[in-house]
Swiss-Prot record:
This is Large ribosomal subunit protein uL2. Belongs to the universal ribosomal protein uL2 family. Residues 206-216 have a biased composition (Polar residues). Pfam families: Ribosomal_L2 (PF00181), Ribosomal_L2_C (PF03947). It comes from Saccharolobus islandicus (strain Y.N.15.51 / Yellowstone #2) (Sulfolobus islandicus). One of its GO terms (cellular component) is cytosolic large ribosomal subunit. Residues 223-238 have a biased composition (Basic residues). GO terms for molecular function: rRNA binding; structural constituent of ribosome. The lineage of its organism: Archaea, Thermoproteota, Thermoprotei, Sulfolobales, Sulfolobaceae. Keywords: Ribonucleoprotein, Ribosomal protein, RNA-binding, rRNA-binding. One of the primary rRNA binding proteins. Required for association of the 30S and 50S subunits to form the 70S ribosome, for tRNA binding and peptide bond formation. It has been suggested to have peptidyltransferase activity; this is somewhat controversial. Makes several contacts with the 16S rRNA in the 70S ribosome.
Amino acid sequence: MGKNLLQQRAGKGSPTFRSPSWLRIGKVRYPNIFGHLVGKVIDIVHNPGMNTPVAIIKLENGTKFLTQAIQGLVINQKIEFGKGSPIANGNVIEIGDAPEGTIVCNVEENFGDGGKYARSAGSYAVVVGKSGDKVLIKLPSDKIKAVSNKARATVGVVAGGGVVEKPLLKAGANYWKYKVKAKKWPIVRGVAMNVVDHPHGGGLHQSVSRPSTVSRNAPPGRKVGHIAARRTGRKEGK
C-alpha cells in the first residue's frame, strides 16, 4: 500500500507543518493609541522567523510594543509616536503629515491595522502624492498604493537590507532558515521517489512512465501532475 503524499500530510495539519508561533517574541505591530507620545528604544532583538531586527519601544504612558528596527536606530534613542511627530528618522507619524518624497516603512493601510506595507528587510516606500483623504505611496514593487491619511508609518528604511547578500554556505543553514517558518525543505521531485511514495516514483530511471494528466475527480493520493489539463506541451504551428 502506498504512503500519503506530502500535500496530504501537510493538509492534515500536524505540528511538523505548522508555523512555530510559540518561538516568536510577540506581534510586530503598532499599538492602537491616539495622540502624541514620546518613547525610548529599550532594546533591539531578533524575532525568530523574521529577517529584520526588532526594536522594543516603551512609550511614556508605559506601553511597550515591537516594531521593525530601521537603519541607524540605536538603543536608548528617543522617538516620537503619533500625530504631530516631526519627520525624523525612527519617528512614527501619521502619513498624512509627511511631505512628498518622504521615505517611510511599515506603512498601515488604515489606522489600527498595525502595518502592512514595506516591512521586510531593507524595504521602504516613498510618499508621491495626496488626493483627498488618501495618500499615494510608491511601494518597493513600484506599484502606487493609496492609503488613509490617518494611517501610521515609520520614517526611514527597514534595517537588515544585506540579509539576502549573506551566503548560506552550507545546507544546514538553509535547513534552519526554513525550519523556523515550518516550510518544507528540501523539495524532492516525485520521479526521484520510490514507487511507494509517489505515483511518479519507481523504475530503473527517472520518468513519469505513465500519462501525467489526471482527472479533476481523482482521489487525493493520485491527484498529482497536470490536473484536469486541457492540453500539455508546446503549441504546434504559428
